[in-house]
Each structure stands twice: as C-alpha cells, then as structure tokens.
C-alpha cells in the first residue's frame, strides 16, 4: 500500500507542524482548557456520519487540551456552570463533509489488482458555549490511492475511507487549534490594551 502511505505523508507532516505551532504550554499544564461538545455532522452521504463522528471524537479525545467530559452535567445550564467552574472555554463543535469521492481505476502498469482512489474535503466549526458565536473553523482534506483485491473491495473501501477521513479530520482540528490559540492571545492583548487606556 505504498500509494496510500505516500499520499498521506505530506498531510501527516502538515498536521504535525500545525500542532507544534498551536499551544505547547496547554499540553504541558496537563489540564484541559477547552470543552468540546460535538453536535452536528453534516454529509450528503448519511451512512458515513456515524464513522465521521467516531473519528472526530477520537481525534478530540487524543488531545490533552480538550475534554468532552463534564461528569454529570447533562443540561446546557449545568454544562455552562461546570465549564466556568473548571475555568475552561466551551465550544459546540460541528463538522461538514463537503465532498467524499470514491473512484475505481485500472490496475497500474504491470499490476493485476485495480486501484481505489478516495478524496475527502471537510471543515470543522466551533461556536462559543454559551453565546453561539462562531470563533474558529478548520479545513482538512486528504487523498489516497491504493490497490485492492476485488473479493475484499467492501472491506478495503471501509479501511481506505477511515484512513482518509481520519487524516482530513486531524488536519482540520490542528488548524482549528491554531486559530483558537491565536484568537485567545488576541483577546488577551485586546484586554490589556483596554486596561492601559483606562489609566490616567
């Protein structure tokens, strides 16, 4: 599956670079700074929604700066109170899968098996909780192509789909983290500027 590996290598490096630029101080603190409540997953292909939600939740859970767990706080009022109690920022996060294409191509020269090409483009959106104000977005895309055995077509398509979605989601979340960190720093600078102007 060298085609798959090659197609995703650049995406992996981009995601790692974005993560490195985001917020090492948050990760070092060991305490979540943001609460993410996964809400809508939008896709023309409704069959892919459960998988997309699972992969988005997995990606968010892998990052120490985020949490999706507020204990027994079930109502929105209780969630907001718990967010403030823990000193976090809360966001309602949604994801839109803009395009998801699967193409079957002829075998590569000298090969017997056909090739499967998958291309996915998506975006995540974060609205403040409370407030419902759009604060950040993150775009992600991934393309891969690999050989597959006809008798294992369905299984390979599922595996390829998960790989492409996972890579695109990682890229989108990494971009969102960078934007979220930048927005927070700008708010702090703005706050300091207002305080300094208030002095006589």
What is each residue range found by the language model?
Residues 9-20:
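Bacterial N-terminal signal peptides
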Residues 81-135:
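Surface-exposed short loop/turn segments
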Residues 1-11:
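Bacterial N-terminal signal peptides that target proteins for export
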Residues 69-87:
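Short acidic low-complexity segments
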Residues 21-74, 141, 150, 177-200:
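A structural "domain/chain start" motif
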Residues 42, 103, 146-148:
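Gram-negative outer-membrane beta-barrel proteins
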Residues 112-117, 127-179:
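Short secondary-structure boundary motifs at beta->alpha junctions and helix caps
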Residues 75-78, 99-103, 142-144:
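Solvent-exposed loop/turn segments at secondary-structure junctions
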């Amino acid at each position: 599956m060298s085609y798959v590996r090659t197609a995703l290598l650049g995406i992996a490096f981009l995601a790692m670079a974005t993560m490195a630029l985001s917020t090492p101080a948050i990760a070092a603190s060991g305490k979540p700074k943001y609460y993410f409540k996964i809400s809508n997953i939008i896709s023309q292909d409704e069959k892919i929604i459960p998988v997309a939600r699972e992969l988005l939740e997995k990606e968010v859970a892998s990052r120490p700066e985020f949490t999706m767990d507020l204990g027994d706080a079930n109502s929105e009022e209780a969630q907001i109170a718990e967010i403030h109690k823990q000193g976090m920022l809360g966001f309602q996060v949604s994801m839109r899968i803009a395009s998801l294409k699967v193409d079957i191509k002829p075998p590569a020269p000298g090969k017997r098996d056909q090739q499967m090409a998958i291309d996915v483009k998506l975006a995540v959106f974060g609205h403040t909780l409370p407030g419902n104000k759009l604060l950040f977005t993150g775009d992600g895309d991934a393309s891969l192509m690999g050989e597959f055995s006809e008798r294992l077509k369905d299984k390979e398509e599922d595996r390829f789909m998960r790989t492409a979605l996972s890579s695109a989601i990682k890229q989108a979340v990494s971009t969102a983290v960078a934007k979220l960190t930048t927005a927070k720093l700008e708010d702090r600078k703005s706050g300091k500027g207002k305080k300094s102007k208030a002095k006589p």
